[in-house]
Amino acid sequence: VNVDFRTALEQPEQGFVVDRSADSTVAMVAFGGIAGGLQIPPFEFFALAGSIPVTKVFVRDLDQAWYQRGIRGLGGSISTAADSLRSVLDDAGAARVVGFGNSAGGFGAILFGHALELDEVHAFAPQTFIDRRRRLWYRDRRWGRPIRALRRSPPDGAVDDLRPLCLAAGGPTIHVHVNASHRLDRAHADRIEGGARVTVHRHASGGHALVAHLRDTNALGAIIRGALDGPGDLDDVRERRS
């Protein structure tokens, strides 16, 4: 990973960071989770692209609002942030763009995957809804404080359920990765599995910290590199160990 890019990644107040040092028409955009991370250090995540030349973009949801308030430095709403991020990608000459995200960042990757018309999205243990009714129905009591803050001051244009986007025609190819035995993560994934372009990959282990587990089993790098190389069958990069 470019040294300047790594240094910028380590600045937690940065809403977005871009590395255009590669001469490439492929870009990867990683969306940080509620704590701004990816379960593993961001520089380590990007390094898993290996020798593939790729423009790298990392965004953080500094408002801890499932990207409902946009991305600081790019725009204060979903639509304005998407427009700015599209300009960044266009300026980099990106013809193929793959989004990645973990947990709340997975929500962001799917959300912006549709807004930006990305080619492919890989969401690890993502939330697919954050509305009160569904959280009560599924008994999802996680992240109570940021959820309450979002409800107290809901932004215009909020998207609290990704299912309609995922079931609509068009949109990116979406790969959702979850631990098959994690009740809540599985429930979030099951709700969008009916989308024609959605594939759910149920891994044997990892819990909600699935990204770290996939890294440790050498599956994460294969997933990332396979996505950047182009569409294909992910069966050969699923984890082999529990």
PLM feature spans:
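Alpha/beta-hydrolase fold nucleophile elbow
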Residues: 93-103
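Short, surface-exposed basic-aromatic patches at helix termini and helix-loop junctions that form
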Residues: 50, 112-120, 191-195
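Active-site nucleophile loop of the alpha/beta-hydrolase fold
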Residues: 123-134, 181
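Short, surface-exposed "cap/lid" segments of acyl-processing enzymes
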Residues: 2-54, 58-65
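Alpha/beta-hydrolase active-site loop
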Residues: 71-91
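Glycine-rich "HGGG/HGxG" loop immediately N-terminal to the catalytic nucleophile
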Residues: 64-72
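The feature captures the conserved acid-bearing segment of alpha/beta-hydrolase catalytic domains
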Residues: 134, 138-202, 208-212, 221-238
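Glycine-rich nucleophile elbow surrounding the catalytic serine of serine-hydrolase chemistry
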Residues: 101-115
